[in-house]
Amino acid sequence: APLSGAHADECAKYLVPITGNIPPELRFASIDSYFKAAQGRGLPLSCAELIGMGTLRTLAAGFTTGDLSPLELRDLHYHMEAALADGACGVSLGLGYAPEIFYSTDGLIRALAPLHRSGVPICVHMRQEGDGVVDALREMLEVARALQTPLEVSHVKAIGSRNARKAVPQ
């Protein structure tokens, strides 16, 4: 969730290899409607939901490349703010995967602008874990500092023996 709007079918199709076909009754328009549906089934629900930037970007712009237009950013921000208001506790990024791979660093900062000084964490799978690992970490530190928001880097690792002793940026 959310999975609604002009690009919802495109987003659902992209998710098929991960989730399988998502039947219409499980395409929730918001995080709130997802939580209500789960609670309505009597499930003992205890979870913290991250809103996926890939989902937000796809809903706003489909699989276009490059930075988002002002109209697409407005749509993305609307969905992000609604998901956070509904109870999402952070924003998840997978910068090694489409469509998030298409962001420039500045474009990423613009897309994440609603998080500025919010205390809402960015949880990221960085662009690189091999030879570009230090640059990828620098990029995310730049984003978090620009937004003045917490950063969580998932699966911190440096692939390849030549990367094992690289200095971590401060």
Predicted regions and their residues:
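Histidine/acidic residue-rich metal-binding segments in metalloenzymes
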Residues: 32-35, 39-42, 67-94, 99-170
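Divalent-metal coordination cores built from histidine and acidic residues
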Residues: 1-89
